[in-house]
Design a protein with these regions (language model features):
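Membrane-proximal helix-turn-helix segments that form the acceptor-binding/catalytic region
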Residues: 74-78, 118, 131-152
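Short hydrophobic beta-strand element within catalytic cores of glycosyltransferases
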Residues: 291-295
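Conserved acidic donor-binding segment of nucleotide-sugar-dependent glycosyltransferases
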Residues: 306-308, 312-319, 327-334
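Aromatic "clamp/platform" in nucleotide-sugar-dependent glycosyltransferases that forms part
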Residues: 255, 274
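N-terminal strand-loop element at the rim of the active site
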Residues: 1-2, 15, 19-63, 174
Length: 340
């Protein structure tokens, strides 16, 4: 699955490669990149394949991580000493906790990018055991390893002020994600269709959106909801849709490489995430003239949307208010145009 981090990283690499020598080092990508990669960018695969253990038990995942992490450190160190880079950037994936400790003869500047809310582990945790793991993970990551980096980059002012303002051990700056593309035209806003986009996974909170849609169809049974994306919760969400007798109203459309085609056909865009980094899809929806109704989750939506002016912000998991804001836009075409 190619998500926002991959998309943004490739876009930045393409731009930097115009005047610099740029390398992207990956661990799992056996195929060509999903998004266009400049021929000036060098792509190297460590061939670690963390993802092949994703669906196994925790024992096998832990066993695999220990063995593969050792391989990863060895191969990454070899590659970096061959490249002799001036700057090395971690996007916050599997290398983040060992990268600044590697012995690289060019003595590069190490930069850590954080593409999600600082508290994503605790926000993601559901069981008591997972919450304890989240506390431990945050301590190891932020209190031990992160201060070894020369600079840390977060995506929003909200994240820096709320989560990093009192931390004097870490040098934090704000660099928002680039706006990679805008819609080439405006949506007509005449179709009776609301769309949402994202991985079918716990953080995207589509179960809450499905629950809210029950209230929407009480007032507007002729409107439909399309959810674009794939993920591990597809079966569970399909069951929720069936159990709530919404199979004629909600459609899971799968993954698309072209997000603008669905946006052009939409009249409203909605985001119900529990947490975000900086959701580019909100900006892309706005660029197509599609009004946005979003949960005011940390972090990102509140940096982009002025509530009641160019969209609506709703308290997280307040499904009745979410449905009400969607219905207000359904019932007022002029408001849709104004907010879009």
């Amino acid at each position: 699955y190619a998500g926002g981090i991959q998309r943004v990283t490739i876009a930045k690499a393409n731009k930097l490669a115009l005047k610099n020598e740029v390398w992207i080092i990956v661990t799992d990508n056996k195929d060509k990149p999903v998004f266009p990669l400049s021929t000036k960018v060098h792509l190297v695969n460590c061939d670690i394949n963390y993802f092949e253990d994703d669906w196994k038990s925790r024992f096998y995942i832990l066993k695999g991580i220990i063995y593969k992490r050792k391989q990863h450190k060895k191969r990454l160190k070899e590659i970096l000493n061959q490249i002799q880079p001036d700057i090395v950037i971690s996007t916050g994936t599997s290398e983040k906790n060992f990268l600044p400790y590697l012995s690289v003869s060019s003595h590069p500047v190490f930069i850590r990018e954080i593409h999600s809310n600082k508290n994503y582990r605790s926000l993601h945790a559901q069981s008591v055991f997972d919450k304890l793991l989240a506390i431990l993970g945050d301590f190891i990551d932020y209190r031990i390893h992160l201060k070894k980096y020369d600079r840390t980059v977060v995506l929003t002012k909200e994240d820096k002020v709320v989560h990093w303002g009192k931390n004097t051990e870490v040098d934090v700056c704000v660099i928002p994600n680039p706006i990679i593309s805008f819609g080439s035209k405006k949506a007509s806003l005449i179709n009776k269709k609301v769309i949402a986009v994202g991985r079918l996974a716990f953080p995207k909170n589509f179960s809450s959106l499905i629950s809210a849609w029950k209230y929407v169809i009480e007032r507007h049974a002729d409107w439909t909801l399309e959810i674009w994306g794939e993920g591990e919760l597809r079966t569970e969400l399909e069951e929720q849709i069936r159990n709530n007798q919404l199979t004629n109203n909600i459609f899971l459309k799968g993954y698309t490489y072209d997000i603008f085609s669905p946006l052009y056909e939409a009249s409203i865009f909605t985001l119900t995430s529990l947490f975000e980094g900086l959701p580019l899809v909100i900006i892309e929806a706005m660029s197509c003239g599609v009004p946005v109704v979003s949960y005011a989750c940390p972090c990102g939506p509140q940096d982009i949307i002025a509530d009641g002016h160019d969209g609506f912000l709703v308290p997280v998991n307040n499904e009745k208010v979410l449905a009400d804001r969607i219905c207000r836009l359904i019932e007022d075409k002029e408001l849709r145009k104004e907010m879009g």
